[in-house]
Amino acid sequence: STNFNLMFFNCDALVDPDFSAWDVSNVTDFSFMFSGCALLNTDSMANWDTSNGTNFSSMFTSCPSFNGDLSGFDFSSTTSLFSIFNGCTNFNRDISMWDVSGITNFGNLFTSCSRFNQPIGVWDISSATRINGIFNSATDFNKPLPWNTSLVTNMSSTLRSMTSFNQDISSWDINQVSNFNLFMYSTTISTANYDALLIAWDAQGAMAYSGTVSFGTSQYTSGGAAEAARTSLIAKWGGITDGGAA
């Protein structure tokens, strides 16, 4: 079969299967394959040839035990990694070597991955248009993210509820972003990082977004360039919610 959609959906009996001999080189649809497999945890997919896979959406959604080796996965035939690890609360494997340069949709990729903290700042996400919810409730994540976001239009809940996150994302290009809903809601970055963000983002000029942008409870330095940039951004967008002046 070339379609593995829902193959083991909600299969509680799947714990440590040996998939090492499986030839998946012709499979195109892996969507929801292991979704809801609460006890699944295996390294036996490490050598799978996924190069023909076009749909990986929610492949491991709601697999709270899963922490398997997927370092060899090939995404050259797909443009979406939507929700693959959503709810994988135990997942924390190094996938920094993945080639994601052709991926446009990273939506909800690590949502509720509360242990995940791997160096994926090296990823080339220059094709991305959606990174909405990618780190929503990824409570342990705190790695640099010097990403090229120049094509991104949706940053809704991108850095939401990240209790450990404190990085400088001032280099992010946000000109095309039309959805900033709950962007950094319930997240706090340092005043230095927030100041840098405000100044750099305001300098990007005109914005596509109209509405309020949440920076959680992050605080800015009053009476200087950061406050001036914040005032300017409020005029461009319509509003900012944050922790006020430091």
Predicted regions and their residues:
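Negatively charged
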Residues: S1-A246
